[in-house]
């Protein structure tokens, strides 16, 4: 009887190990290429660091947000007219969308957007691989 129980335990363990593990959800990244008006650059950076970042960091699922200034294109062409890239990382796309729908986001994003030379910016959504 012990042999049967032992074999059943081994078989159950082998089946559990062979079954694909439930993969945890991976974060998403939103990349936005922005054309910031040179005359508004200091204001945009001030708004990003003192208004947008603190508000975003309090949201459920928030991981990180960065504002990157384009230095140079090492291969290929840089996005036309873009001089900054905004990168936002959330634990899930649903949490990012919930943040976008908040009244706080409706107040803080326009502080960035008003400094842009063009509102025709590229928005790319990535899943972490």
For each feature predicted by the language model, list its residue ranges.
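Short acidic-aromatic low-complexity motifs
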Residues: 37-40, 59
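N-terminal export signals
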Residues: 5-22
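Solvent-exposed, non-transmembrane alpha-helical starts
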Residues: 41-45, 97-100
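A general secondary-structure junction signal
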Residues: 69-71, 125-129
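Short, well-ordered beta-strand segments in beta-rich or mixed alpha/beta enzyme
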Residues: 27-35, 67-102
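A non-catalytic, amphipathic alpha-helix used as a structural packing/dimerization or gating element
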Residues: 46-50
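An amphipathic, aromatic/His-enriched active-site/gating alpha helix that lines ligand/cofactor pockets
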Residues: 7-11, 51, 55-63, 81, ...
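C-terminal segment of N-terminal export signals and the immediately downstream linker at the start
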Residues: 1, 18-30, 39-43
């Amino acid at each position: 009887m012990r042999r049967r129980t032992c074999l059943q335990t081994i078989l159950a363990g082998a089946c559990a190990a062979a079954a694909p593990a439930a993969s945890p959800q991976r974060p998403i990244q939103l990349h936005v290429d922005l054309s910031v008006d040179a005359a508004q650059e200091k204001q945009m950076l001030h708004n990003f660091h003192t208004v947008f970042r603190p508000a975003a960091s309090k949201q459920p699922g928030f991981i990180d947000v960065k504002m990157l200034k384009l230095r140079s294109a090492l291969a290929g062409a840089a996005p036309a007219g873009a001089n900054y890239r905004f990168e936002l990382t959330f634990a899930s796309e649903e949490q990012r969308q919930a943040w976008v729908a908040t009244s706080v986001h409706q107040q803080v994003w326009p502080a960035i957007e008003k400094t842009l030379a063009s509102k025709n910016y590229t928005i790319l959504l990535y899943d972490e691989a």
